[in-house]
């Protein structure tokens, strides 16, 4: 998806806010994983593809009779992506798994389990975004920045064009297929 100049200005402002929130979370709260949840939900729900799905935060779910349909082979992910239908039998389209920016982003048994259970996975630490489909290498990967090796409370950010590319990909990401 191509963005107009006006849309790019709005996206650039959102990128600045995103970067500031990541840095504040790193400094003020050691950027625990749950710090990313509200940022991720805002980003996903703000896209064209995000308006077509139901994004449910299941990060603190426990196994109950009612919640078992959301439980996968690797437990509960952070978010489950469902059909946008007011029903407990809404189709499962995928999931999102977040990690701290300091964490390794290699594929793990947890991610493999989520892929087997949900089909599509967005795996992100806020700085690196990886998009997976069942049994495939990342369909796409985006880098927004990396931890500064000289200052663990700081990020070396990539240019705003990387954000535009991520947002464009998210706009067109088809959860159903």
Which ranges hold each PLM region?
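A short, conserved, highly charged catalytic patch centered on acidic carboxylates
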Residues: 1-120, 128, 132-177
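Charged, structured surface patches that assemble and position nucleic-acid processing machinery
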Residues: 125
């Amino acid at each position: 998806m191509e963005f107009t100049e006006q849309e790019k200005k709005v996206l650039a402002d959102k990128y600045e806010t995103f970067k500031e929130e990541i840095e504040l979370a790193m400094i003020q709260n050691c950027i625990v994983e749950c710090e990313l949840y509200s940022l991720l939900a805002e980003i996903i729900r703000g896209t064209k593809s995000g308006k077509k799905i139901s994004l449910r935060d299941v990060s603190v779910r426990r196994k109950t009779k009612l919640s078992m349909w959301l439980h996968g082979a690797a437990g509960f992910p952070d978010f489950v992506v469902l059909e946008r239908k007011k029903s407990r039998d809404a189709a499962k389209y995928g999931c999102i798994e977040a990690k701290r920016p300091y964490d390794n982003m290699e594929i793990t048994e947890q991610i493999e389990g989520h892929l087997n259970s949900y089909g599509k996975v967005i795996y992100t630490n806020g700085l690196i975004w990886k998009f997976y489909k069942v049994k495939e290498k990342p369909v796409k990967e985006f880098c927004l920045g990396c931890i500064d090796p000289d200052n663990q409370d700081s990020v070396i950010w990539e240019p705003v064009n990387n954000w535009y590319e991520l947002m464009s990909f998210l706009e067109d990401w088809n959860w159903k297929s």
